[in-house]
């Protein structure tokens, strides 16, 4: 008790010294908490994927250009045993697009895909169901559904997409709490009756024990883009990239929009170093107060 009283008397006498150390300690801890939250979000990108370590995207390199593509487009010249593939999810990004609801035009970012998308990614169902088998169905995110219909029940409502086709809302899903590489407002059915006129992408989940190094070695051999067209001499290679690395790839798309987000590891390292320095500063301030 006497020690505590002595410390309080000294702290009150050295008010400036005490205030500086207390403010330094509080500021350091506050900044560390903010930075740690940011760092945690960067390291937990796409954790809503069922298994982000085993889901792969296709990276195509052609004559110095790299882009995300689809394996099935070139599968006539790629020798990957079909039995190694567990799930194939094909989707077409429709960024910078729009739809019409109740006579009003709304900008949107959409993915045209099928129900296999939900075998790779887990979303909480808010209303309706997660089903894209009906070619006239659409699934909205919770925030976008509120933007279109407010507090009304969106299930059964009809929207008109930019291609002139009408779609009926079959479900509403919540956006994941974590950060995601793919961001969208709605999911549309990718069926033969819906032609999107944009390049599709594909995600794959392979069976346990699949030799990914061997598959990527196969893809590293240059192949002709159109082997049946003698005049087309373009060559390409491909590689399968784990989904958890797509966010860090920095591989820009030809169309800038809001669907893809990218991470910067160099920037993250700077923030980690800054967090460590701030933590050390806070520890020094605590030691200064403790040794009074």
Where are these predicted regions, by residue range?
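Hydrophobic alpha-helical transmembrane segments
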Residues: 4, 18-19, 270-271
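A hydrophobic alpha-helix feature that marks transmembrane segments and, especially
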Residues: 273-292
């Amino acid at each position: 008790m006497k020690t505590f009283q002595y410390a309080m008397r000294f702290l009150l006498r050295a008010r400036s010294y005490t205030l500086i150390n207390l403010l330094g300690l509080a500021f350091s801890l506050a900044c560390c908490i903010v930075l740690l939250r940011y760092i945690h979000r960067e390291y937990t990108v796409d954790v809503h994927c069922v298994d982000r370590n085993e889901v792969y995207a296709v990276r195509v390199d052609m004559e110095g250009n790299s882009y995300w593509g689809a394996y099935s487009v070139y599968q006539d010249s790629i020798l990957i045993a079909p039995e190694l593939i567990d799930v194939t999810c094909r989707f077409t990004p429709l960024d910078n697009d729009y739809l019409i609801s109740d006579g009003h035009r709304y900008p949107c970012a959409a993915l045209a895909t099928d129900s296999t998308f939900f075998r790779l990614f887990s979303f909480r169902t808010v209303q309706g169901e997660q089903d894209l088998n009906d070619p006239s169905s659409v699934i909205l995110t919770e925030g976008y559904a509120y933007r279109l219909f407010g507090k009304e029940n969106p299930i059964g409502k009809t929207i008109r997409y930019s291609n002139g086709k009408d779609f009926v809302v079959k479900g509403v899903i919540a956006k994941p709490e974590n950060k995601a590489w793919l961001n969208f407002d709605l999911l549309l059915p990718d069926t033969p009756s819906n032609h999107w006129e944009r390049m599709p992408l594909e995600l794959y989940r392979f069976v346990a024990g699949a030799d990914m190094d061997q598959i990527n070695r196969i893809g590293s051999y240059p192949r002709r883009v159109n082997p049946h067209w003698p005049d087309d001499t373009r060559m390409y290679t491909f590689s399968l990239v784990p989904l958890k690395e797509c966010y860090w790839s920095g591989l820009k798309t030809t169309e800038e929009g809001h669907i893809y987000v990218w991470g910067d590891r160099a920037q993250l390292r700077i923030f980690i170093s800054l967090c460590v320095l701030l933590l050390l500063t806070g520890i020094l301030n605590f030691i200064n107060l403790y040794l009074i």
